[in-house]
Amino acid sequence: SNEQNPTVTYSTAGKYKVTLVASNDMNTSTAEQEGYITVLPGKDIVLFYPFEGDSKDMGPNAIHPEILKLGDNMDVNFNAPARKEGFTCAEFRSKDNQNYAFLSLPDNDALDFQATPVTTSFWVKTSNKTAANLGVFQHGAGPNASTDGKNKQTWFRFQKSSPFIRYVIEYSGLSGNWTDYKTKAMTDGEWHHYVCVHTNGSTYLYIDGVKAAEALNKGLKPIDRKPYFIGAMYR
């Protein structure tokens, strides 16, 4: 496009390389800049947090979280260096199970997943080898917070001993899906991509594009719509 403020429509979600060329009226000075644009699917996406300088949800539901802090000098830094130069990520500062910061999402109808298929995808880098449980997300009520006293929650955490990762659909004690990764600790200080899938009573964990663990045919489990937390150190 040669327009001053062009509007470009993409028919398919994905990542596209774009080139911006700018010049003055006399064409005596020209600047060219290459970059990438990410186009999200407009259907079925619930949350999208790029964490590029802030905690805003860039998805269609605009579910913006608040920072909750336990202890002194705990916070979430949204200007930490990301895995690619020039980009930022969220750094969750923590010390122990009494001193950490995390994000809390406001209640929203879009978070009422119940037993519908859900995929959660994220990048994490950690070198913390001492925390007993290092949480990434937790959604739904535990037994002490639910009116019926039942677990109706899902969560993902790193552990310092085997199983090194647990992705769980927890319902009525241990009757849910406990998807355990036991191969090796992932607290190696490198970026890794994780995908958690819950569908038709089965759960799957993918690490860097490879299926690493699964828990099959456990039956459909409802998940409470609140609370929803991202990042925490506990226990």
PLM regions: where:
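Surface-exposed, flexible coil segments in extracellular/virion-facing regions
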Residues: 1-9
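Short, solvent-exposed loop/turn segments at the edges of extracellular beta-sandwich modules
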Residues: 23-28
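Extracellular glycan-recognition modules
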Residues: 42-46, 55-59, 96-168, 188, ...
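Short, tryptophan-glycine- and acidic/Ser/Thr-enriched carbohydrate-recognition patches
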Residues: 50-78
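Low-complexity, glycine/proline/serine-rich flexible segments
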Residues: 68-116
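Short, aromatic/His-centered strand-loop micro-motif at the edge of beta-sheets
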Residues: 167-193
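Localized edge beta-strand/strand-to-loop motifs within extracellular or lumenal beta-rich domains
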Residues: 190-204
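Flexible glycan-contacting loops in extracellular carbohydrate-active proteins
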Residues: 215-235
